[in-house]
Amino acid sequence: MNYSTLIAVASLLTAGTESKKDGYPVKEGDCAFPCGYDNEYCDKLCKERKADSGYCYWGNILCYCYGLPDKAAIKGYGRCRPGKK
């Protein structure tokens, strides 16, 4: 089997698949969602954002999501800037 056939088959198998990522979902201003140790709140919030699941990460007391769509915004390295888009 030559390489071009192998590449074509691999491309067809991955076409239309959406990758997923994990992270802290954010609202305006790159601000994550505080959770106060409420896992149910975070799980609901994450699922509303099309994630597989979520929980309240006790170290930062912020919601953390598993399986967010690749297009979903997650917390970067910058500071929270409330009121900024």
Curated annotation (Swiss-Prot):
InterPro entries: LCN-type_CS_alpha_beta_dom (IPR044062), Scorpion_toxin-like (IPR003614), Scorpion_toxin-like_sf (IPR036574), Scorpion_toxinL (IPR018218), Scorpion_toxinL/defensin (IPR002061). It holds the Pfam family Toxin_3. It is found in: Secreted. PROSITE patterns: LCN_CSAB. Residues 1-19 form the signal peptide. Has the structural arrangement of an alpha-helix connected to antiparallel beta-sheets by disulfide bonds (CS-alpha/beta). Alpha toxins bind voltage-independently at site-3 of sodium channels (Nav) and inhibit the inactivation of the activated channels, thereby blocking neuronal transmission. Belongs to the long (4 C-C) scorpion toxin superfamily. Sodium channel inhibitor family. Alpha subfamily. This is Toxin To9. It comes from Tityus obscurus (Amazonian scorpion). The lineage of its organism: Eukaryota, Metazoa, Ecdysozoa, Arthropoda, Chelicerata.
